[in-house]
Curated annotation (Swiss-Prot):
The keyword Chaperone applies. The lineage of its organism: Bacteria, Pseudomonadati, Pseudomonadota, Alphaproteobacteria, Hyphomicrobiales. This is Urease accessory protein UreE. It comes from Rhizobium meliloti (strain 1021). GO terms for biological process: protein folding; protein-containing complex assembly; urea metabolic process. The gene is ureE. GO terms for cellular component: cytoplasm. Keywords: Chaperone, Cytoplasm, Nickel, Nickel insertion.
Length: 154
């Protein structure tokens, strides 16, 4: 059954169960107009006014009622650890200087795998491990969130 969506919401308390779930990578979650294929072979025509970066848990509101939940796919990432908090800030600076998408968490940074960057980080004294996790990088200083109506965004 084909669906159409022109609106994205962040979930609020007491949301109903979604009709379907759609698992997308970080790169796939940045979109505006696209035909999305669900696991059951149904399709959703997403047609938004502006490009958005969908977050894990966002809801595609379907014309005619219901919604589809967006899930962040596990991706091949590097888990970067530092000797101390100052060293972690230095590593983050080097990654930011290269304009790399990065998820900064307490005690670690996550980035997409790149052997050249891994060698640089290890040369700077970082511990770099390969992990497979959903990727939620920080938005840049010039990023504008494209959601119209929403309850929360974390």
């Amino acid at each position: 059954m084909p669906y159409r969506s022109t609106e994205v919401l962040s979930p609020g308390p007491g949301e109903r169960a979604p009709l379907h779930r759609l698992t997308l990578t970080h790169e796939q979650r940045h979109l505006r107009r696209k035909l999305l294929h669900l696991e059951n072979d149904d399709v959703v025509m997403l047609d938004l006014k502006e490009p958005v970066m969908l977050a894990d848990g966002d809801l595609l509101v379907l014309e005619g009622g219901g919604h589809i939940e967006v899930k962040a796919a596990a991706e091949a990432l590097y888990d970067i650890r530092a000797r101390n908090p100052l060293h972690l800030m230095e590593l983050a600076w080097h990654l930011g200087n290269r304009h790399l998408p990065a998820a900064v968490e307490e005690g670690r940074i996550l980035i997409a795998r790149d052997p050249v960057i891994r060698a640089m980080l290890e040369g700077l004294g970082a511990t770099v491990d390969e992990v497979n996790e959903p990727f939620h990088p920080l938005h840049g200083a010039y990023h504008q969130h494209g959601h119209g109506d929403h309850y929360r965004h974390g």
